[in-house]
Design a protein with these regions (language model features):
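N-terminal [4Fe-4S]-dependent radical SAM core
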Residues: 1-27, 72-73
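Canonical Radical SAM [4Fe-4S] cluster-binding loop centered on the CxxxCxxC motif
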Residues: 20-57
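Cysteine-centered iron-sulfur cluster-binding motifs in ferredoxin-type domains/subunits
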Residues: 30-37, 85-88, 276, 332-334, ...
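Radical SAM/AdoMet-radical enzyme domain recognition
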Residues: 63-80, 89-212
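Radical SAM enzyme [4Fe-4S]-AdoMet core and its adjacent flexible, acidic
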Residues: 150, 154-162, 169-276, 281, ...
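Short, ordered coil/turn segments that flank beta-strands lining enzyme active or ligand-binding pockets
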Residues: 284
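Flexible mid-to-C-terminal extensions adjoining Fe-S/redox cofactors in radical SAM and related proteins
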Residues: 295-394
Length: 394
């Protein structure tokens, strides 16, 4: 029996190559399909209209291949589900995915799942599934009613805030932790404190702020984000977080990333990693790309439903110039915040080879690094810093 026949039977084969290092793959089972009509969405409307759901054969081949491609020493394999709105794939789709994960998971390997949703379609059945299988949930909510309904309406232009809040309340009722993802653009740049306060008021303990950067040909007229506004917004969040005494109580991923990267030399975010290319994305038809922000022919790696193993496709992504040349510019090399910035996301680099948010990152990172520089960049340094912070808080 040859390799193609074994794949057809969905049997893991030891002869398949494994990746040299763990890699992540973000899956879009419904592609651009969504029940909201966010005014800044980077998916063109025509792409949202022609999307289709991933079929069961491709789902099975992907799960089998993704598990088989990870290094033998991997002790956890994470599946990331995103959209569009991934809940549109239906609860049965994820039940099948979970069954396939159990079927192909090697002994001693933990399988985990993360899913990003707008929260409006959540119900008790979804929450029971997520709770039972320990899903890590992200919920997209840009702010209070005024902000959310203005920038993230439904397909008919109507309000979405109440539906999103109902979804969040369900997660809390089922005792499911969630990360609140908020998009930052010039239209909300002067509302950082109010947006932070609202997130905390609705019970969110894990927050993440994502800069809006226009990509492709999406109809995002009137939206943008200047470097100055990005830096101003994040500095305001940082100061609010400190002034309210939320250290150790509310976790802002943009802040935690700096702390982690300073003391461990490793970034939890591909945006600020020294190299990227280890976070692939798969469309519902099986096309694999090197990055969620680089969905174009230049960064197409291949197809998951064809005969090239995923480990081989992942190796191609790791060797692409965009991931290796992030911070090679002379200005980056001598920048005082390079250790936690690393040039930012390559998709946000302009024709002048500067990251369009450079000045904002510099202002934000400089403020966070100032009190850290007195401590060694080591686990021991982290312990000393935490002790000092605790003493001050006490």
């Amino acid at each position: 029996m040859n390799l193609a026949q074994l794949r057809a039977q969905q049997i893991p084969v030891e002869s398949e190559p494994r990746a040299a290092a763990p890699f992540h793959l973000l899956v879009k089972p419904i592609g651009a399909g969504c029940n909201l009509g966010c005014r800044y969405c980077y998916y063109p409307q025509r792409q949202q209209e022609r999307t289709r759901k991933m079929d069961d054969d491709l789902l099975a081949e992907f799960i089998r291949g993704y598990i088989a491609a990870q290094p033998r020493y991997s002790r956890e394999i994470n599946f990331v589900w995103q959209g569009g709105e991934p809940l549109l794939a239906g609860i049965g789709f994820y039940k099948r995915a979970l069954a396939l994960q159990r079927r192909y998971a090697p002994p001693g390997v933990r399988i985990s799942n993360s899913l990003q949703t707008n929260g409006t379609l959540l119900n008790d059945a979804w929450c029971r599934l997520f709770r039972q299988h320990h899903f890590i949930l992200g919920v997209s909510l840009d702010g209070d009613r005024e902000v959310q309904d203005a920038h993230r309406p439904d397909k008919r232009g109507g309000a979405s805030y109440d539906a999103a809040l109902r979804g969040i309340a369900l997660l809390q009722r089922h005792q499911i932790d969630f990360n609140l993802l908020m998009v930052v653009h010039d239209g909300v740049a002067d509302r950082a404190e109010a947006i932070y306060d609202h997130a905390v008021a609705i019970g969110a303990r894990y927050l993440q702020f994502q800069p809006l950067m226009l990509e492709g040909d999406a109809p995002t007229a009137g939206y943008g984000l200047s470097a100055a506004n990005w830096g101003r917004f994040m500095l305001a969040v940082y100061r609010r977080w400190r002034s309210r005494g939320h250290i150790g109580q509310v976790f802002v991923m943009n802040i935690e990333q700096v702390y982690a990267q300073y003391f461990t030399h490793v970034s939890p975010s591909c945006v600020h990693a020294e190299r990227c290319g280890g976070n692939l994305v798969m469309e519902p038809d099986g096309r694999l790309y090197a990055c969620d922000h680089l969905i174009n022919a230049q960064h197409l790696l291949g197809h998951a439903d064809r005969h090239t193993p995923l480990a081989t496709l992942a190796a191609r992504a790791a060797e692409m110039p965009f991931g290796k040349n992030k911070s090679l510019r002379r200005e980056c090399q001598r920048c005082s915040v390079k250790s936690v910035c690393q040039g930012g996301c390559p998709a946000h680099v302009g024709e002048d080879r500067y990251n369009r948010l450079c000045a904002g990152y510099y202002a934000f990172f400089s403020a966070l690094l100032a009190p850290l520089r007195a401590y060694p960049r080591s686990p021991q340094g982290a312990m000393q810093w935490r002790a000092a912070v605790s003493a001050t808080a006490g």
